[in-house]
Curated annotation (Swiss-Prot):
This protein's name: NH(3)-dependent NAD(+) synthetase
Keywords noted in UniProt: ATP-binding, Ligase, Magnesium, Metal-binding, NAD, Nucleotide-binding
The enzyme's E.C. designation: 6.3.1.5
Top-level taxonomy: Archaea, Methanobacteriati, Thermoplasmatota, Thermoplasmata, Thermoplasmatales
Pathway: Cofactor biosynthesis; NAD(+) biosynthesis; NAD(+) from deamido-NAD(+) (ammonia route): step 1/1
Cited function: Catalyzes the ATP-dependent amidation of deamido-NAD to form NAD. Uses ammonia as a nitrogen source.
Entry GO MF terms: ATP binding; glutaminase activity; metal ion binding; NAD+ synthase (glutamine-hydrolyzing) activity; NAD+ synthase activity
GO biological process, one term: NAD biosynthetic process
Any Pfam family the entry gives: NAD_synthase
Residues the record lists as binding deamido-NAD(+): 110, 143, 150, 232-233
Keyword Coiled coil: no
Top-level EC class: ligase
Length: 249
């Protein structure tokens, strides 16, 4: 197991070094396990002075999250900059008349993306994403919010893989044990919103996309429907231009 996990760590490190190609890394950290893992790998893969990490709390951020951010600073040796987004979000809410928690949650995610890309412009950096494979396949991310980035180093890892690698790389235990939450509104937890835990989700996704079992029961259909409904999040905008021109010169 150690050899396998070390191989995963080294391949992600190589990917980051190659794709950053000397540029700075800009990353948003939430005190959750995914961003903590990516920051930990970055801290071992490139010089720490090239890493610009941002914690963007709001009124829903729990006191324990601030403690975990300090622990993450200690374990990685990377300074994490704090920018409170509540006043920015309130400006959007008052201007647009937003009174739905899900719409407001998407605004919060997109405000964080704006801050990251502003700093990427300022610092000659690339935004490093933190979406895992489980979230990616079911579309559990905000389009042009936390889904907006230049590199996705852990998108090939299921949530269970993330936990395993985080433990191997000694991410703070309080972060690993924490109940997953996007923190987009009060008392929001991933597994409550999704209707099942990540362990079950990972098992079903592996059956559907790797073992090709097909839909075996209602739980499988529920997960497959999440995948179908979120396909637009995984595609580039439709265009009348031939796709060859997007990538070839």
């Amino acid at each position: 197991m150690v050899e396998r996990l070390d191989g995963v760590f080294k391949s992600i490190s190589d990917f980051l070094r190659q794709e950053l190609n000397g540029k700075n890394a800009v990353i948003g950290v939430s005190s959750g396990i995914d961003s903590a893992l990516v920051l930990t790998i970055l801290s071992k893969a490139i010089d720490k002075d090239r890493i610009h990490a941002f914690f963007m709390p709001d009124r829903f951020t729990r006191s324990a999250d601030f403690d975990d951010i300090r622990s993450l600073e200690g374990s990685t040796g990377v300074k994490i900059n704090e920018i409170n987004i509540e006043n920015i979000v309130n400006g959007y809410k008052s201007t647009l008349g937003i009174n739905d928690k899900k719409y407001e949650g998407n605004i919060r995610s997109r405000v964080r993306s704006v801050i990251l890309y502003y700093n990427a412009n300022l610092l000659n950096g690339l935004v490093v994403g933190t979406t895992n494979r489980t979230e990616y396949l079911i579309g559990y991310f905000t389009k042009y919010g936390d889904g907006a980035c230049d590199l996705e180093p852990i998108e090939h890892l299921y949530k269970s893989d993330v936990r395993e690698l985080a433990s191997y790389l000694k991410v703070p235990e309080s972060i690993i044990r924490k109940k997953p939450s996007a923190g987009l509104w009060g008392d929001q937890y991933d597994e409550d919103e999704l209707g099942m835990g990540y362990e079950e989700l990972d098992s079903i996704l592996k059956d559907l996309f790797e073992k090709k079992t097909g839909i075996l029961d209602d739980r499988y259909k529920m997960v497959y429907d999440m995948y179908i409904r979120s396909q637009h999040k995984r595609k580039l905008p439709k265009s009348m231009m031939n796709d060859d021109f997007r990538y070839n010169v």
